[in-house]
Amino acid sequence: MSGGKYVDSEGHLYTVPIREQGNIYKPNNKAMAEEINEKQVYDAHTKEIDLVNRDPKHLNDDVVKIDFEDVIAEPEGTHSFDGIWKASFTTFTVTKYWFYRLLSALFGIPMALIWGIYFAILSFLHIWAVVPCIKSFLIEIQCVSRVYSIYVHTFCDPFFEAVGKIFSSIRINMQKEI
């Protein structure tokens, strides 16, 4: 495993590890690779995505897991009819499910495009502007830090050492008078 390349037990070369269940682009990748019996190189841009666990890093565990019981609750002694309660539950759940799907269908790809552009710009600026500026600043500040260090060792160290010696001879006696 070197340079981001993965070689399996049969000598197949991959840029990312291949899972048993495959990915969205080529289902059952490993089985297909074994059937074809040739070296295939997979790009990180078409990396495998999990269609079952879509939040593997648990980014939204505490934010968007909102169920009917989290929003609507009837305390003891104040209950609606059972049919109304069941219909409300079904209406809430189905509406939330399909409206999310509708919003995802309408705005998912444009939002992915916007966030992709945003993070591309952010990465570009970090790589080509922020890090070079910080490195340049650190190189230039070394000169200032040497002058500052000489100043501190020449003037501040002796001054504070003298003040420390002056205050080190102070003795405090506390007596309690009855």
UniProtKB/Swiss-Prot annotation:
Stretches within the membrane that do not traverse it: 105-125
Sequence positions bearing Phosphotyrosine: Y6, Y14, Y25
N-acetylserine modified-residue sites: S2
Region (Required for homooligomerization): 2-94
Pfam families xrefs: Caveolin
Post-translational modification summary for this protein: Phosphorylated at Tyr-14 by ABL1 in response to oxidative stress.
Subcellular location as annotated: Golgi apparatus membrane; Cell membrane; Membrane, Caveola; Membrane raft
Region described as Interaction with CAVIN3: 82-94
Membrane topology annotation: Peripheral membrane protein
GO biological process: angiogenesis; angiotensin-activated signaling pathway; apoptotic signaling pathway; basement membrane organization; calcium ion transport; canonical Wnt signaling pathway; caveola assembly; caveolin-mediated endocytosis
Organism annotation: Mustela putorius furo (European domestic ferret)
Covalently lipidated residues, kind S-palmitoyl cysteine: C133, C143, C156
Function recorded in the entry: May act as a scaffolding protein within caveolar membranes. Forms a stable heterooligomeric complex with CAV2 that targets to lipid rafts and drives caveolae formation. Mediates the recruitment of CAVIN proteins (CAVIN1/2/3/4) to the caveolae. Interacts directly with G-protein alpha subunits and can functionally regulate their activity. Involved in the costimulatory signal essential for T-cell receptor (TCR)-mediated T-cell activation. Its binding to DPP4 induces T-cell proliferation and NF-kappa-B activation in a T-cell receptor/CD3-dependent manner.
Recorded GO MF terms: ATPase binding; identical protein binding; inward rectifier potassium channel inhibitor activity; nitric-oxide synthase binding; oxysterol binding; peptidase activator activity; protein heterodimerization activity; protein kinase binding
Modified residues (Phosphoserine): S2, S9
Keywords, ordered alphabetically: Acetylation, Cell membrane, Golgi apparatus, Isopeptide bond, Lipoprotein, Membrane, Palmitate, Phosphoprotein, Ubl conjugation
Main location: Golgi
Subunit record text: Homooligomer. Interacts with GLIPR2. Interacts with NOSTRIN. Interacts with SNAP25 and STX1A. Interacts (via the N-terminus) with DPP4; the interaction is direct. Interacts with CTNNB1, CDH1 and JUP. Interacts with PACSIN2; this interaction induces membrane tubulation. Interacts with SLC7A9. Interacts with BMX and BTK. Interacts with TGFBR1. Interacts with CAVIN3 (via leucine-zipper domain) in a cholesterol-sensitive manner. Interacts with CAVIN1. Interacts with EHD2 in a cholesterol-dependent manner.
GO cellular component, one term: cilium
Record location of the Glycyl lysine isopeptide (Lys-Gly) (interchain with G-Cter in ubiquitin) cross-link: K5, K26, K30, K39, K47, K57
Residues in the Cytoplasmic compartment per record: 2-104, 126-178
Family classification: Belongs to the caveolin family.
Region described as Interacts with SPRY1, SPRY2, SPRY3 and SPRY4: spans on this chain: 131-142, 167-178
Protein name in the entry: Caveolin-1
